[in-house]
Amino acid sequence: MDFELTDEQRLLQDTVRRFVDERILPNAVENDINHHLDLDAIQGMAELGILGIVIPEEYGGAGLDFVCEALACEEIERGEAAFRTLISVHVGLNSLALLKYGSEEQKQRWLVPQASGEKLACFGLTEPAAGSDVAAMKTTARREDDSYVLNGSKNWISYANVADHALVFAKTDPSAEHKGISAFVVERGMPGFTTLDTEHKLGIWAGSTGELFFENVEVPAENMIGEEGQGFEIAMYGLDQGRFTVAAGGVGVIRACLERSVEYARERETFGQPIGKYQFVQDMISEMVLGYETSKLLVMQAAWMKDQGLRNTRETSLAKWHATESAFRAAHLAIQVHGAYGYSAEYGIERYFRNARAPIIYEGTTQIHKMMQAEHALGFRNLNGRGGDVSPLCSWAPALASVNRPKASLSSGR
């Protein structure tokens, strides 16, 4: 079993680490306090190839593997969650879905400029009454000649007000539940398509979150991705890709909290000795170490499976669930280690705490992932498909039980 990184992977890791240290972290606290989205940093990410990191070179991407993507997301979220969120939405939810389901013409039209960062994309799935229950969406797409007319709205959409276009999911057959959902690329500037900022969020202040509104928006039929009724499948595929980057970003949060806490615990003294000498502080540090190591192992297991072309819904779900919960716990502990300084916005620790809360909700809540894992273990379904792939390291694929299982829809929160 080889845990070594290749020279290419180490080079990518070092390059992104320097970028975060030089371009993101110096302004991270100020941008967060001022609710400022640093577009120059996004341009820098594009120049490094991060916005097309796993997209093949033939479509303008960097053509790197998923281990590289995980390493990049870890480093980026060590600096700022808003920029890892962009990778999740732009690359994971959108570009990889286009790569799998888009026609060659659609790939040239949208994927190529997305991979270079020339254009940014967002993912329009979540609605006010349709989060985990995707099939409950109200947005509709009615066929009229060579177009579809979209009506409805989406909320909690990352980069809604910045993206050049959105991958939007709407019901072409409202009576068919999830089988009646289709996917469309809706471009900014189309008449009737508007966006609005979402304000007063708990965290990710340095990012962009908003709403999408569709009022009789005529979308050419050629903008449909895949086939009519294939939207749910496309959304679930995109979520597998997005969840992977969320998990990898969670690893970055834990590492940031651990590094800052270790540094502080070695320097801060009380009663004549560093606070790191006290067992209660050591307990918190050790818990962060465990969270980091276990989360990274789960992420790398999923990355390996993705690079082998194996279905990894189960493994990615585990990684997302564990890493996001561990990240929030690590941020809580880091504040405790730092005491009053951890509570101060200017010190930058509480930012990780606020930002780490959202990933526990989007890309499937913790409760959704627990349900998925339990149903898999009980044999009610195989998350990687009937007779699907399993990790050779920690396989768990019981025979499917011949019982009726409850219907379950999986959430994006995007």
Residue ranges and their predicted role:
Residues 95-101, 123, 135, 175:
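Flexible, glycine-rich active-site loops centered on histidine and acidic residues
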Residues 136, 189-220:
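Flexible, small-/acidic-enriched active-site or ligand-binding loops
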Residues 1-89, 101-106, 113, 117-118, ...:
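Alpha-helical interface subdomain recognition
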Residues 147, 151-195:
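A short core secondary-structure module
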Residues 87, 114, 129-132, 156-159, ...:
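Short Gly/Pro-enriched turn/cap motifs at secondary-structure boundaries
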Residues 107, 124-127, 137, 153-156, ...:
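Glycine-rich, charged/polar anion/phosphate-binding loops
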Residues 64-65, 133-135, 159-163, 177-180, ...:
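Short glycine/proline-enriched turns and hinge-like loops at secondary-structure junctions
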Residues 117-125:
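A short, Trp-centered hydrophobic/proline-enriched beta-strand micro-motif
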